[in-house]
A protein has these predicted regions:
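FAD-site-proximal beta/loop scaffold in flavoenzymes
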Residues: 160-185, 280-342, 353
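Glycine-rich, N-terminal phosphate-binding loop of Rossmann-like dinucleotide-binding domains
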Residues: 13, 134, 146-147, 288-289
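C-terminal auxiliary extensions adjacent to catalytic cores
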Residues: 44, 383-431
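Internal hydrophobic alpha-helix adjacent to the cofactor/substrate pocket in enzyme cavities
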Residues: 340-364
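Beta1-alpha1 glycine-rich phosphate/pyrophosphate-binding loop at the start
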Residues: 35-114, 197-238
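A Rossmann-like FAD-binding core segment of flavoenzymes
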Residues: 113-122, 130, 137, 215-304
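Glycine-rich dinucleotide-binding loop and its adjacent helix/turn
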Residues: 33, 147-219
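N-terminal secretory signal peptides and thylakoid transit peptides that target proteins
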Residues: 1-17
Length: 431
C-alpha cells in the first residue's frame, strides 16, 4: 500500500482547512484507515481478532484456534507477559513470589494464535477494522476483553497523585505496591484501604487483601494497623467469613469501618477525607470506582460499561462484536477472573459455531458459572460459587449462590488447585 508523500500531505492539509470541522473529521477518518500499513497480509480465511490478553481474551483466542484450526485468530495485547490478579494478594502478603502469577504467551502462539504486542487505538465497526499503534487489522468477528480503567476523578485530589498510589487491581501494579509494603514493614503506621461501592473488579478482592495485609503485619511484627474504610454497610461478598476472620485473627492489626465514603485526598498532608472526618495514613491503598476500558466508549459500545444481548455475550450494538470479562454492565455476573475465563470458553464455542455456518438463532444460549476463593490467612480460605440460568419467559438471568464462610485449610488447597487448573488451560503447563 502506498505511503503519503509530501505533496499529498500538503493537499490533505489544504482540504482540511477549507472543508471545515465536520468534513475534516470525515477526511481524517478516511485517511486514518486507508493509509496505514496492514499488520498482516490480507486474510484468506475467516479472521477473529481478540483485544486484550487477560483471563477472558486469552481463553477466547486459544479455544477458537483449537476448535477452528482453519480460522486465523489474532490476539492483541500491549504487555508481553500475563499476570494473574486472582491470587495476587498472596504476593502482596509475601506468601508467594511474583513468578507464581506470571505466564508468557508461548503456548498460545504455539497453538497457532497470532500474538500482536500492540495497543489498540481505534476500531471502525462499519469497515471491521482494528487500528493499532503499528497498523490495522480487518476482522470477521471481534472480541473485546480490554479490562477496566479507574475513575480517579471520583475522589478529589487522587488523579494528581495517582502515580504515587498504585491501586493493585490491574496486572503488574502489584509490583510497585509490594515495594511500598516492604518499606512500610520498616516504618509501621497506618495502612489505609478504601473499598468503593460496586460494581468493581473482583468484589471480594479488597476484603481478602485487607486480611492478608493484616496477616503480613502480624507475622512480621510490624507496629502498624490496616484501617479499612468501606463505602458499603458490610463486605459485599462472604461477609460472615471475612468479619469472623477480622475479629478472630486480627483484632490488633485491622480496623474495619463500614458505611464510610471518601470525599477527598490530601496526599501532601497524608490524610484521607471522609464524611466522618479525616483519617491519617502512612501508606494508602485506595480503590477508586471503576469503568470499562476507554476503547469501549471510544467506539460507541457503552458509557461506564458496555451492554450485551442477554443471554449471549454479543454487544447490543453490533452482532459481530463480543464483550468478555469485566467490561459488561447489564448482567448479574461478578467481574471476576473465573467469569472472564468461563465466558471466554462460551464465546469461543459461539464463534466457532458461527464460523461453521450456524445462524445466531440456531445456537442455544450458554450461561457461565463462577467460583471465588478468598484467603484470610496464609493457610485458610473461604469461597462462594454462583450458578446462572436463563428465564426465557421473564427474559432475564437468574442467579443461585452457595457460600462457605468457614475458613479452612481444605479451602486453601482447593483454591490452589483451581488456579493451577485454569492457568494451565489458558497457557499450558509451566516449563
Amino acid at each position: 500500500m502506498s505511503k503519503l508523500n509530501r505533496r499529498q500531505l500538503l493537499k490533505a492539509g489544504a482540504a482540511l482547512t477549507a472543508a471545515g470541522t465536520l468534513a475534516s473529521q470525515a477526511f481524517a477518518q478516511q485517511e486514518f484507515y486507508a493509509r496505514p500499513p496492514t499488520l498482516l497480509p490480507a486474510r484468506r480465511t475467516a479472521r477473529v481478532v481478540v483485544v486484550g490478553g487477560g483471563w477472558g481474551g486469552t481463553t477466547v483466542a486459544r479455544k477458537v484456534k483449537q476448535q477452528r484450526p482453519e480460522a486465523e485468530v489474532v490476539l492483541i495485547e500491549p504487555k508481553p507477559l500475563f499476570m494473574s490478579c486472582p491470587m495476587s494478594n498472596l504476593f502482596l502478603a509475601g506468601v508467594k513470589p511474583l513468578e507464581f502469577l506470571v505466564f508468557d504467551y508461548t503456548q498460545v502462539v504455539n497453538d497457532g494464535v497470532v500474538f500482536v504486542q500492540e495497543r489498540v487505538l481505534d476500531i471502525n465497526r462499519d469497515r471491521r477494522l482494528v487500528r493499532t499503534t503499528g497498523g490495522y487489522l480487518a476482522y470477521d468477528f471481534l472480541v473485546l476483553a480490554p479490562g477496566i480503567d479507574y475513575m480517579y476523578e471520583a475522589i478529589p485530589g487522587y488523579a494528581e497523585v495517582k502515580h504515587l498510589l498504585p491501586v493493585g487491581f490491574k496486572p503488574f501494579e502489584h509490583v510497585a505496591l509490594r515495594r511500598m509494603l516492604d518499606r512500610f514493614d520498616e516504618t509501621g503506621g497506618e495502612l489505609v484501604m478504601y473499598i468503593p461501592n460496586p460494581p468493581y473488579r473482583c468484589p471480594p478482592g479488597p476484603y481478602e487483601r485487607a486480611a492478608m495485609l493484616a496477616w503480613r503485619l502480624k507475622t512480621k511484627g510490624v507496629k502498624g494497623k490496616v484501617i479499612v474504610l468501606d463505602a458499603n454497610p458490610q463486605p459485599i461478598s462472604k461477609a460472615p467469613g471475612f468479619l469472623a476472620a477480622y475479629n478472630d485473627l486480627y483484632k490488633n492489626q485491622l480496623e474495619y469501618i463500614p458505611n464510610t465514603r471518601i470525599t477527598g485526598l490530601d496526599y501532601e498532608k497524608k490524610r484521607v477525607k471522609t464524611e466522618l472526618g479525616d483519617v491519617p495514613f502512612t501508606l494508602a491503598d485506595l480503590i477508586p470506582p471503576m469503568k470499562a476500558a476507554e476503547i469501549v466508549r471510544q467506539v460507541g459500545l457503552g458509557e461506564r460499561w458496555a451492554n450485551v444481548q442477554p443471554p449471549y455475550f454479543l454487544s447490543e450494538k453490533d452482532e459481530r462484536v463480543y464483550l468478555v470479562g469485566d467490561i459488561t454492565g447489564n448482567t448479574p455476573y461478578p467481574k471476576s477472573g473465573m467469569i472472564a475465563y468461563v465466558s471466554g470458553n462460551i464465546v469461543a464455542r459461539h464463534i466457532s459455531q458461527r464460523l461453521g455456518g450456524k445462524a445466531l438463532a440456531e445456537i442455544p444460549p450458554e450461561l457461565p458459572t463462577n467460583v471465588c476463593y478468598s484467603f484470610v490467612d496464609s493457610e485458610e480460605a473461604i469461597w462462594v460459587s454462583n450458578a446462572y440460568s436463563w428465564d426465557e419467559a421473564a427474559k432475564q438471568i437468574k442467579a443461585q449462590s452457595t457460600v462457605d464462610n468457614q475458613r479452612s485449610a481444605a479451602n486453601s488447597t482447593a483454591a490452589y488447585g483451581w488456579a493451577q487448573s485454569l492457568w494451565q488451560d489458558m497457557f499450558g503447563p509451566r516449563a
